[in-house]
């Protein structure tokens, strides 16, 4: 499995708690917040309930337009807090026989991420340090192997860039070649 963001958390849960370990050789988690987002916890505590709901309604409406039949933005954000991830990690140990690795990128500046990552980057940096606009590097470390994608030049590699969300050419980073290399490395390792 190669999973991005929350997909890495869901994949770990499926492998360990849903009996999928016999069917999975490896999990590569790309920009996954294994240890959660401290900034999410802080914002959920500080933003008044009415404002939180208004933000959630806006995101939920957008997600419905994209095809999600029952979006729940607040539940998703709450699920990504540091405390929620700590609880999840306690009941989701790595499965024996499954190779776990993680990959992370980072932005050099807020403007290197598209909205809303350009807005969240400085907040994440304040609470969690080096980040991709959403996930901190330290939160993404998981498994036997950790790879940090080092952006060349002044441009960083955002949370959306690693899945080509913005369809941009980034000097020194070819997203297609990244995944081809990732798959080739897994093949070399026997997965």
Where are these regions (language model features)?
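C-terminal catalytic-base region of ester-bond hydrolases, centering on the histidine
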Residues: 90-191
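Serine-dependent carboxylesterase/thioesterase catalytic core
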Residues: 1-85, 132
């Amino acid at each position: 499995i190669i999973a991005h963001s929350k997909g890495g958390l869901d994949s770990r849960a499926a492998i360990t708690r849903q009996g999928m370990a016999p069917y999975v050789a490896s999990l590569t988690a790309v920009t996954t917040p294994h240890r959660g987002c401290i900034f999410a916890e802080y914002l959920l505590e500080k933003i008044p309930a009415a404002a939180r709901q208004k933000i959630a309604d806006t995101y939920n409406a957008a997600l419905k337009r994209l095809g999600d039949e029952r979006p729940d933005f607040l539940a998703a954000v709450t699920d990504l807090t540091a405390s929620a991830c700590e609880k999840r990690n306690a009941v989701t140990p790595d499965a024996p026989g499954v190779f776990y690795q993680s990959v992370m990128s980072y932005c050099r500046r807020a403007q290197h991420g598209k909205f809303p990552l350009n807005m969240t980057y400085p907040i994440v940096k304040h609470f969690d340090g080096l980040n991709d606009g959403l996930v901190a590097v330290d939160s993404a470390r998981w498994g036997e192997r950790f790879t940090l994608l080092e952006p060349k030049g002044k441009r960083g590699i955002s949370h959306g860039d690693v899945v080509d969300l913005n369809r941009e050419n980034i000097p020194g980073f070819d997203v297609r070649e990244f995944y081809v290399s990732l798959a080739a490395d897994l093949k070399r390792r026997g997965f």
